[in-house]
Amino acid sequence: MKVVILSNGPGNYSTKRLAEEVRLFGHDVQIVKYKECYASIEKSNPTVKYQGEDLMVDAIIPRIASNMTRYGTAIVRQFEMQGVYTASNSIAITRSRDKLRSMQLLAKAGVGIPKTVFSRNTADIEDLLDQIGGTPVIIKLARGTHGNGVVLAETKKAAKSVLQAFYLHNEDGTNILLQEFIKESAGEDIRAIVVGGRVIASMKRQSL
């Protein structure tokens, strides 16, 4: 089986380890910088090219950076059109990059989450804060990684100031979320790895 790892960081530890494991299972593996891929959309013969050659593969492992989500998932979709197996499909990747969409899906599935509210109207701030139990409150952008765009507002005044600043740069209110502050978490969260609908590993992450 020929496997392609889509990664713009071929030298990254995680990418190299994935390649090592694929080889251990006896498969051929190639690391491809998806930002350098280009595609042809055709009804009968959709293609993906890299360095002038058609990529003919059996499976892909997408490692799509958050700042390349739109282009990266477009390349993944192109492989999906060919019937190529993908470890993470384009829909799952897109959903995971939108915190609001993720929260809605988790809540629908019955998974416990912090109380979360959103609105695009600054006049709703008072009611939003009341709905999640007041301050302190977590305010975050729906799209962001590594803690960027996340603020802990200790008071109502601080929360209003942060929200008003965020609203100035985000006309679409779904880009801004307010969440109840879970004191007991103390900057910790749990990351779970799900394969085939089952959690196969987990880790606790502690903010510095």
Each predicted region: which residue ranges?
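Conserved N-proximal alpha/beta basic substrate-recognition cap immediately N-terminal to
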Residues: 8-115
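Short, hinge-like loop/turn segments at secondary-structure boundaries
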Residues: 47-50, 103-107, 132-134, 155-157, ...
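Short hydrophobic segments within beta-strands
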Residues: 6-8, 195
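Extreme N-terminal starter segment of soluble prokaryotic enzymes
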Residues: 1-4
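Structural detector of well-ordered beta-strand residues that form the stable sheet scaffold
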Residues: 86-87, 114, 138, 177-179, ...
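Rossmann-like NAD(P)H-binding beta-loop-alpha module
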Residues: 112-134
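ATP-grasp fold ATP-binding core
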Residues: 106-107, 129-148, 170-185
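Phosphate-binding site of ATP-dependent enzymes
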Residues: 152-208
